């Protein structure tokens, strides 16, 4: 991040995994006179806050289990390079894993999910940003009414769009189990999706099961459908990218996320599923855009971007989706960008949190005379920006003014993904956007429909009938006891990483303890692997250590002799070389902590190598002192 933003100073480059870095880039020569007091105040506030909070925060797994002995979930938001071993440790301690942590290799994901399955646990993730367990929102999640619909989703914003529409339709969700976007890939084989479906089939309060997937591997998709056709509960499923022409057997197949939610609510209310849920929209009372004007989509949600790109491509026969440089659609001037793609998040926060990259693109598109409509999403909920609407409106107003000066019409069309119970409030967000001249639709699919209508293009959906399913079925396995215990109680969560994730858990009645995790061995991955391997022999090591300590306890020490240090330590006899002996492993001055450096400066003054602390510091920084363990 620092390198990409030209802030990687020599000092920052030498920092280790447990260091805090504060880097300032300013044209003011005396900026440090302003910055240092602010840093001191921040650290003082942090320290004061810590005295009240750290009493209930753990710094190790053993402390976390002491604080919450009945824990059954570990929620991870730590750097991916350290993630897999920590998740494995959690699974081996019989904890379900919810991993917001990403950048975990596909090989590690497969290994961890197989381990979880063998132990009767759920491995939700990696790269799982959204979940609802027993109506408690976890991570980047909306506040949804409790109900009788269970959701399994390999898509974060897909879960958010479906569950929030369910809420606004008067329905409710008891569980939304995120799996991570790669779960239905051929390598992973839908391990978590299958386990979650089986669990919801056996969960009595769940009456309807909803499955949401990014484009799956065909063989894996077929296996999931076979399982869905084998269970007793009604199912609605959406495999993004597919345009089903009928429902199959027990499984209702949706084309859009909105249709998915509407079918789920009808099933939950014992209402007959309609042949068609498409609703025509009235065209706004504004001039129709000419044919050469195009739609530009700027999305913070990857699944919402894919759905928008899919619908535009289908309507205009643009050849389908792409995946290049953040684009999900780029054809004939039409563009839809997933601003949450790695290309846009490297070195900066996710666009659900930070509006800057979208503001930049709004300004860029406003200058393009071909742009007629800018289509975008606003995702509300825990973890999202506290006021994304307020952050975007000035840029929208500026862009419309730019177009007006050039004699062009420029329309903004938005979908707000949220509920009235979200911290940002759905209705307030919608009202403020409308006041700012934005056309707001009730769903992402309707937002695309409205955008095309502004160009005079009307779209529709064909009726879908239920046809017989003639494929194979499977014997539905029994769910693990630990999974069922998770679904029938409030979760008890060890939060490993971002403390802000505890907020929604506490607000909605879950138990949690904060684990202020840091990488072991100062982030040295080789040493971490060694320590992890040693843990498998912890009982034997403890037994051998007891033998040694017993010998020490039973021994009787006695004085042998007292001699000058120089007589037994030859390194101290070189008067030309300043030497300090220290406890612990070898260490250099640059690697020492503040207290250790202070002790060294004190030793230098005692030995009269310097007259004051400033001169002593120069001696050490010049490398004049040798350190011997």
Regions found by a protein language model. Give the residues of each.
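Catalytic-core regions of core metabolic enzymes
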Residues: 1-475
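Long, compositionally biased, glycine/small-hydrophobic-enriched stretches that function as flexible linkers
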Residues: 1-53, 82, 430-432, 463-476, ...
């Amino acid at each position: 991040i620092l390198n990409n933003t030209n802030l990687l100073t020599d000092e920052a480059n030498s920092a280790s995994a447990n260091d805090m870095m504060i880097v300032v880039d300013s044209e003011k020569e005396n900026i440090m006179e302003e910055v240092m007091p602010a840093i001191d105040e921040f650290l003082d506030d942090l320290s004061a806050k810590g005295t009240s909070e750290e009493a209930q925060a753990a710094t190790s797994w053993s402390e976390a289990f002491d604080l919450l002995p009945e824990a059954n979930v570990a929620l991870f938001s730590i750097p991916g390079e350290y993630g897999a071993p920590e998740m494995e440790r959690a699974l081996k301690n019989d904890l379900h894993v919810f991993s917001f942590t990403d950048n975990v290799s596909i090989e590690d994901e497969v290994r961890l999910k197989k381990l979880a399955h063998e132990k009767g646990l759920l491995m939700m993730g990696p790269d799982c940003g959204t979940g609802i367990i027993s109506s408690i929102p976890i991570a980047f999640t909306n506040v949804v009414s409790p109900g009788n619909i269970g959701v399994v989703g390999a898509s974060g914003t897909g879960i958010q769009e479906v569950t929030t529409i369910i809420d606004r339709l008067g329905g409710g969700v008891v569980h939304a189990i995120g799996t991570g976007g790669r779960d239905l890939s051929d390598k992973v084989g839908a391990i978590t999706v299958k386990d979650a479906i089986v669990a919801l089939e056996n969960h009595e309060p769940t009456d309807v099961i909803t499955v949401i997937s990014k484009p799956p591997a065909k063989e894996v998709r077929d296996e999931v459908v076979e399982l869905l056709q084998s269970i007793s509960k009604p199912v609605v499923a959406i495999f993004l990218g597919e345009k089903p022409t009928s429902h199959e057997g027990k499984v209702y197949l949706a084309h859009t996320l909105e249709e998915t939610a509407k079918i789920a609510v009808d099933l939950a209310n014992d209402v007959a599923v309609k042949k068609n849920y498409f609703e025509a929209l009235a065209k706004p009372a504004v001039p129709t855009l000419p044919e050469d004007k195009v739609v530009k989509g700027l999305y913070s949600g990857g699944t919402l971007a894919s759905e928008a790109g899919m619908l535009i491509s289908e309507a205009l026969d643009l050849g389908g989706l792409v995946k290049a440089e953040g684009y999900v659609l780029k054809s004939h001037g039409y563009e839809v960008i997933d601003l949450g793609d790695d290309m846009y998040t490297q070195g900066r926060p996710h666009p659900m949190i930070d509006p800057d990259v979208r503001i930049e693109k709004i300004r860029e598109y406003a200058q393009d005379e071909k742009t007629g409509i800018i289509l975008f999403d606003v995702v509300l909920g825990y973890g999202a920006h506290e006021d994304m609407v307020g952050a975007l409106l000035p840029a929208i107003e500026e862009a419309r003014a730019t177009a007006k000066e050039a004699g062009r019409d420029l329309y903004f069309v938005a979908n707000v993904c949220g509920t009235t119970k979200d911290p940002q409030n759905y209705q307030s967000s919608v009202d403020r956007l409308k006041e700012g001249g934005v056309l707001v639709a009730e769903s992402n699919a309707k937002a695309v429909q409205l955008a095309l209508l502004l160009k005079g293009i009307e779209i529709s959906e064909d009726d879908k009938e239920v046809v017989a399913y003639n494929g194979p079925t499977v014997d539905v396995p029994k769910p693990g006891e630990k999974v069922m215990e998770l679904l029938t109680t409030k979760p008890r969560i060890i939060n490993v990483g971002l403390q802000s994730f505890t907020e929604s858990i506490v607000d909605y009645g879950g138990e949690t303890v904060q684990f202020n995790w840091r990488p072991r061995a100062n982030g040295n991955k080789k040493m971490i692997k060694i320590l992890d391997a040693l843990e498998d022999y912890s009982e034997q090591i403890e037994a051998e250590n007891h033998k040694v300590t017993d010998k020490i306890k039973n021994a009787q020490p006695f004085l042998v002799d007292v001699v000058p240090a120089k007589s037994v330590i030859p390194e101290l006899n070189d008067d030309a070389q300043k030497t300090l002996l220290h406890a612990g492993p070898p260490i250099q001055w640059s690697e020492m902590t503040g207290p250790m450096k202070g002790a060294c400066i004190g030793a230098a003054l005692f030995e009269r190598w310097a007259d004051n602390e400033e001169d002593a510091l120069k001696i050490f920084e010049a490398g004049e002192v040798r350190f011997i363990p």
